Amino acid sequence: MSSAPRGPPSVAPLPAGIGRSTAKTPGLPGSLEMGPLTFRDVAIEFSLEEWQCLDTSQQNLYRNVMLDNYRNLVFLGIAVSKPDLITCLEQGKEPCNMKRHAMVAKPPVVCSHFAQDLWPKQGLKDSFQKVILRRYGKYGHENLQLRKGCKSADEHKVHKRGYNGLNQCLTTTQSKIFQCDKYVKVLHKFSNSNIHKKRQTGKKPFKCKECGKSCCILSQLTQHKKTATRVNFYKCKTCGKAFNQFSNLTKHKIIHPEVNPYKCEECGKAFNQSLTLTKHKKIHTEEKPYKCEDCGKVFSVFSVLTKHKIIHTGTKPYNCEECGKGFSIFSTLTKHKIIHTGEKPYKCNECGKAFNWSSTLTKHKRIHTGEKPYKCEECGKAFNQSSTLTRHKIVHTGEKPYKCEECGKAFKRSTTLTKHKRIYTKEKPYKCEECGKAFSVFSTLTKHKIIHTGAKPYKCEECGSAFRAFSTLTEHKRVHTGEKPYKCNECGKAFNWSSTLTKHKRIHTGEKPYKCEECGKAFNRSSNLTRHKKIHTGEKPYKPKRCDSAFDNTPNFSRHKRNHMGEKS
């Protein structure tokens, strides 16, 4: 194919009117071969550094433009296989074909544009026009013309006159070409060219006065200030409360009944979405349609099953940068990070108490509202937490799934088993800061601390006796009432306290969990072991005032005292 020495070159008809010219064009070097238009001709690539400098709105704009360009090519009937870039963008991922190094500009081509009736919409024409500037503007845009595959030079001249307005767009000051030293970029405004250069040099001239953070463009600094200064842009129309994030406003709206039209008939709780109400109802019905194929455990919500499955794989892809701890779920890592920051962003409006997590605040609020949405089907007792209901159910079933490997004893709760194991391990992780005494159970430490303060806030109305712990007062009241609620299933004997029943049961089972490390002798009570140890140490702490005798236990000491008083033992 040849072109006339003067005038516009002739272009062979192309499929759908699209293609590249094979002719030499004045002002442009080299002879170019004809080829079909590809997605690469209308795609814009970013380096990793450039992509990271874009804010979210700019990245979203890029995604939309690239997807539109691809759809337009398909609309025009051009056979284009789906590029990896488009697949990534459709899935919401980062672009897959980011440049890892500086790109060298390819030799230009003369891009033949299309007749007006071949453009499906104006936006496509504008997009192609910008791409021409980006790819070929370096070589001068005065030679780029919109052409149709015309049969003669005269027909081409007539056609050309219809595109004067569009050709003028290529020569306006708004479309000046700015050459970046590292990347061949065409930017349509001088300010954009400056921004691009700042991103490549790493300069960040815009600094936040509050925290010292630097940004490469002013818009990034503005966005940062919104977060840093906690400016409340989003206002609740119902109560007037303002928030700095739209998501926080959405969560807040739930507290207003007028925006929660979906109400639970069982407990009266209201929700702003019917789907949320449906999920909530499963609490009352105990419906659990989602079953784990590995262990058979069932769940009421599919997302919880998905999270549960990770237990079987053992995968923990989310690691804490502070302590290195790994987590199977990203949200768990986010919650964990609050431990290091000490942040407690969730505050109770009733009492002012603050919490690390929103779920803890939700549970806490039930103390004030008295809400108990979790009801036992056996006895009708209600609870404010699902975990408490789960533990309660074991009372009816009698199930004891947690077994001690040392002695074979079984327990209803895992926490009770953990405490029990400390008998053998001698572990005492809870230490008193005042006296250094250590305990195996946290509640025992809490009770012990009151010794140092001397406080006895719990008083008996019958006799006036005061106690440090509420549970001790409850047990004391049984002295007056004669109540013995703890009954032995073996012999029928009843006791005031559960601890006494536990000790009594060892008579029937023969269990002796307290073992002497010196001689190996075992005892069914810790107090008996303590007394026994004095045999090995020779300690005799009990001494009468009237003589030099000493005793290693209180019973012998008491008998000796009665001898002094003339009493017969």
Swiss-Prot record:
Residues 1-12 have a biased composition (Pro residues). Residues 66-108 form the KRAB domain. GO terms for cellular component: nucleus. Residues 1-31, 536-569 are annotated as: Disordered. Its main location: nucleus. GO terms for molecular function: DNA-binding transcription factor activity, RNA polymerase II-specific; RNA polymerase II cis-regulatory region sequence-specific DNA binding; zinc ion binding. A zinc finger (C2H2-type) spans 206-228, 234-256, 262-284, 290-312, 318-340, 346-368, 374-396, 402-423, 430-452, 458-480, 486-508, 514-536, 542-564. Transmembrane segments: none annotated. Keywords: DNA-binding, Metal-binding, Nucleus, Repeat, Transcription, Transcription regulation, Zinc, Zinc-finger. It is found in: Nucleus. GO terms for biological process: regulation of DNA-templated transcription. Residues 536-549 have a biased composition (Basic and acidic residues). PANTHER family: FINGER PUTATIVE TRANSCRIPTION FACTOR FAMILY-RELATED, ZINC FINGER PROTEIN 100-RELATED. Belongs to the krueppel C2H2-type zinc-finger protein family. May be involved in transcriptional regulation. This is Zinc finger protein 273. It comes from Homo sapiens.
